[in-house]
Amino acid sequence: MLRLVENHSLAHSAAHSMPRTAAFFDLDKTVIAKSSTLTFSKSFYQGGLINRRAVLRTAYAQFVFLAGGADHDQMERMREYLSALCRGWNVQLVKELVAETLHDLIDPIIYDEAASLIEEHHTAGRDVVIVSTSGAEVVEPIGELLGADRVVATRMIVGDDGCFTGEVEYYAYGPTKAEAIRELAASEGYDLSRCYAYSDSATDLPMLEAVGHPHAVNPDRSLRREALSREWPILDFHRPVRLKQRLGGLSVPPRPALVAAAAIGAAAATAGLVWYASRRRSTAA
């Protein structure tokens, strides 16, 4: 059973009359212009979580990521490095550092084109789901900033002392992203043949293949080749813009509410995969 949130019953009844739909967005280099995790390295340094050497190493990783994307082996090395790096970090301190610097670091690097797409999908009655390999402590507040209805993100094991152990509970990457959206579709009544997905990386091919309307955004060479051969739309996002400038006087969306997942598969359930459902979610697709 899913723990209900406000007006969820209305959405549930509507789902019986019409299949619901969603738009699934990768985060890094799809919605924002950089790696969400690596962007906070300076904040983590100032907060005493990492040293200067780690700052330089993450800066180099950011450069490699931006220059050519990351293939499977690079993503695995990055996962191992970041897992070891965050061992012993106090989770509450991480959340506080992210909250304090979120608008300064992330707001300016959100693609205007992505923000427009998110608005268009919401206007069309679709849920918006951020599906990211980055850690939940970083992705969840970014999802809130963007007005996303749900978030799927990597989760680290937290010890009894409130610190990361350095072990990964759930890794939102490649096939596991596709598995997550299929399970979410089953629980929420999404018709995946009518859903949309957006990513920049060939590592997200399973997620793109899972929906009826896949889109390549700023694709790496491998994904561009696949998109061309399959005649998928290829989008070019290149205009980062501050949401405050873009949205003007609009109010910030209400904070998403946690949805407890029960039917997401044994591996994902054990891992503590989190989804967020906005209280302002649409009731039809």
Q: Model-predicted segments: where are they?
A:
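C-terminal cap/substrate-recognition subdomain and adjoining C-terminal extension
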Residues: 2-11, 18-20, 103-285
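Active-site neighborhood of HAD-like aspartate-dependent phosphohydrolases
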Residues: 2-71
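Short, surface-exposed helix-loop/turn micro-motifs enriched in polar/charged residues
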Residues: 32, 74, 130-131
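A metal-dependent, Asp-based hydrolase signature
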Residues: 36-37, 49-120
